[in-house]
Amino acid sequence: MTLLANSKRKPTLAHSGANGRLFMLELSGGRIHSMRPDGSERKVIVSNCRLPDGIVVDVAAGHIYWTNMGSSPSANDGSIERADIDGRNRKVIIPQGVTHTPKQIHLDKAGGKLYWSDREGMRVMRASLDGSNVETLVQTGQGDADARDQTKWCVGITIDPKCKQFYWTQKGPDNGGLGCICRANIDMPKGQTAANRSDIEVIFDDLPEPIDLELDLKNRVLYWTDRGDPPRGNTVNRAPIDVEPHLGDVPEIVLTHLMEGIGIALDVPRDRMFVADFAGSIYAARLDGSDKRDVLFAQGNLTGIAYADI
């Protein structure tokens, strides 16, 4: 179909589907895949990862960064690696023993930092892009007893550079309705620590099981996946961030019928999102959830996903 110059109708996602590139993690196979957003040119660029979960792309430097949860939650052998965008020159930048179970990860290119959530470590962490200067920003618990309390498990992470804040999810028990989304200032309050900082806000609570977070900085909207039970779980949700949070507010659901939704990536200039679920599907849709379509189906247990305009 040819769109006339004066047509007010939006093109469908298929018209811009091949722009950019997706990077996705296959947990079951321990692999990183790269492909066009329409599913073409798919290839494996990294193999032999130890339960990969979150991924980000630094286009300017030509790097990808990803988290490995490690051999098992009890082993405390998670790590973070870096490689070139084509998968070459792989390097461990956060070795085993520094972070317990690293989950989703966020790149703050301007600030020169990587942020990530550590599930069994019950913390939000960050480091310089070379893996140095590791810091703990939030510590929700300590010890084995706390580590069994899933309400303390940190999973998703994103930052708001404008307001100098970061957001994270605490997922709660599987399908438990005890998940929450929190935020705090990037700068630690003077005289306080990751375990006792007083600036933490809970902006949504009683969520089924929130996982990954992404911010649409242009429109000031927070998006997240939830892998809990329907009707509010197995969804993509969104909410504006520049309004005063009121616990009990119900966020807008924009996508439904996921099969344990995990990763989410936004391409705001082209009005589209990409979502990965644990049943092995990749979905594309507009930011309002319309024009949903399948990109991949039943391709292993998929976790993190990232979009790069390359």
Label the model's feature ranges:
Residues 1-44, 57:
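An edge-strand/N-cap motif at the start of beta-rich repeat modules
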Residues 3-19, 49-62, 96-113, 142-165, ...:
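Beta-rich, blade/repeat-based domains predominating
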Residues 28, 38, 48-50, 86, ...:
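Conserved loop/turn at the beginning of each blade in beta-propeller domains
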Residues 29-30, 70-74, 121-123, 172-176, ...:
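Short glycine/acidic-enriched loop and turn motifs that connect beta-strands
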Residues 31-33, 78-81, 123-126, 179-182, ...:
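A short loop-to-beta-strand structural motif that recurs across blades of beta-propeller domains
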Residues 40-46, 89-95, 133-148, 198-204, ...:
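A short beta-strand motif characteristic of beta-propeller blades
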Residues 128-129, 184-193, 239-246, 287:
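Short loop/turn segments immediately following beta-strands, especially the blade-tip
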